[in-house]
Amino acid sequence: MRPFKFFTSLAMAVTLAFAVSSPVRAAYPEKPVNLIIAFTAGGSSDVQARIMQKYWNKYVKQRWVFVYKPGAGGMIGFTEIAKASKDGYTFGGMNLPHMVLQELSQKAAFTSDSYEYLAQVVNDPQCVAVLKTSRFKNFKEILDFAKSNPNKLKVGLVGPLSGHHLMYLEFCKLFPEAKITKVFYKGAADQNAALLGGEVDLIFGNINDIMRSISEFRILNVASEKRNAFLPDVPTLKEQGINLVSDIRRIFACPKGTDPEAVRFLRVTLKKICSDPDYLEDMKKAGQPAEYLDPASLEAYIRSLEVVDKKLLQENGLIK
């Protein structure tokens, strides 16, 4: 074989081999991308993702296909994300600290190392809410009643092993003499419906979910360091002398080992969306507290949660 012909054939072979072995090409995405939502339709995670989809469509031709996998405080959906195809055509929305709590409990089929982290998009403080017709006008009245009437009150939580559950555990640690029965729901839409229907007396939930029923709910306190811009007239728990700060963060991730080109594209596009002024305005209108974290900062935050939350779970006998 002549030298020129040999090297030409070799180059063609290498090019062909690369094309066959690479699952993602320059045209990614070439088809719709599946987005797994680990909670019920209509909940805060779904609402946020729908807003983000609008701006994904602004920058990307291929649309999202929403896949709902609710239940077990998000664990079912988080598992689906971890086990999804690594071709770049499936990623999902996840919640913190839910994912970390479930990992630490040793009941999950995933760990924090099961994912490629793409972005944090929301930091949503939690709050305490009752019906407007409730006898309780402030959190102290709830505490006093719970102390005198153990387990008579019911609190609705999304869970188990969710941010709502964590806030409940922190509450129990601060006030061991105040006994309140916990009731778990698959998602925030179910949780809100339970309070509206009288199944529970109060709920611990994130601001965005609760604000969607604000005409019928009374928000007693916010579990944040300072008053929230969406609820400027509602005092923090700290203002009431209760040292409890709790939030739920929404992030996006795909399975560990997903094609690097797809991961890069998703990270760049989500960051672009999160800095779009129109997106931020839509998030504000929807009561969604937007807060972007890049993948490295997000992973560092997750590692810090693993240390702090492990101790609380151990104290409650939820892990060894």
PLM region descriptions:
Residues 1-6:
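Positively charged n-region of N-terminal signal peptides that target proteins for export
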Residues 8-19:
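Bacterial N-terminal signal peptides
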Residues 30-32, 173-177, 258-320:
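An extracytoplasmic/periplasmic, membrane-proximal ligand-sensing/linker region
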